Amino acid sequence: MSDLKIALTHADAREERTVTTGTKAWELFQDDPSVIAARVNGALRDLAHELADGDQVEPVAIDSPDGHDILRHSTAHVMAQAVQQLFPDAKLGIGPPVENGFYYDFDVDTPFNPADLDKIETAMRKIIKEGQRFSRRVTTDADAISELRDEPYKIELIGLKGSGASTGSTTEAVEGASVEVGAGELTIYDNIRRNGDVAWSDLCRGPHLPTTKRIPAFKLMRTAAAYWRGNEKNKQLQRIYGTAWESKDALEEHLHRIEEAERRDHRKLGRDLDLFSFPDEIGSGLPVFHPKGGVIKRVMEDYVRQRHVEEGFEYVGTPHIAKEGLFYTSGHLPYYGEAMFPPLDVDGMDYRLKAMNCPMHNLIFRSRQRSYRELPLRLFEFGHVYRHEKSGVIHGLTRVRGFAQDDSHSYVTKEQAPAEIKHLLDFCLGLFRDFGLDDFYLELSTRDDSKPDKFIGSDEDWAVATKVLEDVCIASGLELVPDPGGAAYYGPKVSVQARDAIGRTWQMSTIQYDFNQPSADRFDLHYTAADGSRQQPVMIHSAKFGSIERFIGVLVEHYAGAFPPWLAPVQVQAIPIAERHNDYLYDVAKRMQAQGLRVEVDDSDDRMQKKIRNAQLLKVPFMMIAGDDDVAAGAVSFRYRDGRQDNGVPLDEAIRRVADAVASREQV
């Protein structure tokens, strides 16, 4: 045997090692049970991978992001094996890892029910206990088709190998398919029993755990219907979702987070707190705000409008529809056509519901000659836009078909662009802090160089724009995560990702550098420079919340419906102990309303404790309770949402407490 030299990177330390020919990756990590795979020369590999001379090797721990994906992918295989044991006629779709879990799609005659999931879990535990080995083997297209002749969906994937498998498919479906086939060699994974028999096989690129025994904790979560490859024209399959974690404690923590997320679900709270609804008569993805929800929306919009003015923006307004040709000029047609509603025939001419505001803002800029002295020129509006979202992705307020976008466009010189992007990023982060979100990271979306037909503009323009955004992000000191291929067709973007009270991440602001729409081929925007020459501005798109509706949904869940006083629909619930105290509290309410505070008096026939309970259920920040002694003293019992109560508080003091809490924009 000859010696091989490899480099092992572990815990930020690099070690040169000499090993013998035939050494497998697992031999480097025998003393570390947390390692379940290896990254060899940048590519994820099974621990059974044979090393070569010069390899750069890194361990992959089960609790790392890559480790989670491998664990969940392997668990998906075990689940599919169990399903085919219990339901021999089930045909396999795809089974990739996803955020916090995995799924597998099956073609079965009857949808799975909860009892089926229990049986599948039991069968999975037996497979895990057996310690079946995941074994990779390379095959040819012809051999794979022969071996998998009873699996029509797998054969279809083999036919799509290397083609991208994307025609008519959702992004999730494309990514799921890529787990099974890709542009490289075709592989099958066998689950092998200890006696050497093959228990089950699946078309897959891997990598996988060494054995099924390395699955510490899992749970099947739910079932759903899903179209094959995410295309509504294809057959509807049955999908089983599950989750897997590196320990039972980690699984329990995840399940607790799910319970907490369900408790905070904005759709349920919106109904319970009478904030908004989704009437079938109007249509899917088109929310209606009730009076209390309307208060939150108005307060948010008023504050955001005020802050934009303070930051140098000018408020504008544009219509909901426009001639179709406008969107060809901007490039949204054809690049963004699938997300737009079909054309409307108006007097023999095609119009479109707008899906974005930027083309109309460009027309405002172009409406007269502009001077360099006017730049940066910042335009802003709450523009109502409409997106043709598929019904399967619509979700409460966070994914809708019609929404108000807090949309702004800055027109700047190339030299002003870095400072303007920094200004916009600081503005966005400050707004989120005002609304109680203060845990962020940034994501930089760039173009996919392998798909030039999906992007417009020169390589040089893209390089300059990307560098400007990247420099500003790095200077912010926030974590920066790359998102290759995620850019808009007209330029790169940075998005602010905010974590809520239970650690979930939400994409919030987007800031996009656009060198295309101002160009002569598009809107031909220009300004007169100091030397009298005609120059093209850079256009910077920015949506602070992306969607007012979506941000309200996020805040409902972040606060679990218990809004800080400045946002609460009702800031004070006045509770008379008896009917004779009603007039006193109505006078108190008028006094507070004159100061702009939102007060309601509960003059129902309910007993006082029931009134307090009702106010707690509505998550009202403050209660003012009055009886005979309070009326005589010109005071109230001042009660907080958390149950604390101060008795005999003079009216002036009670009102000041509320006003100060509202002005501070802090939670109580």
Swiss-Prot record:
The gene is thrS. Its main location: cytoplasm. GO terms for biological process: threonyl-tRNA aminoacylation. SUPFAM superfamilies: Class II aaRS ABD-related, Class II aaRS and biotin synthetases, ThrRS/AlaRS common domain. GO terms for cellular component: cytoplasm. This is Threonine--tRNA ligase. It is found in: Cytoplasm. It comes from Nocardioides sp. (strain ATCC BAA-499 / JS614). Homodimer.
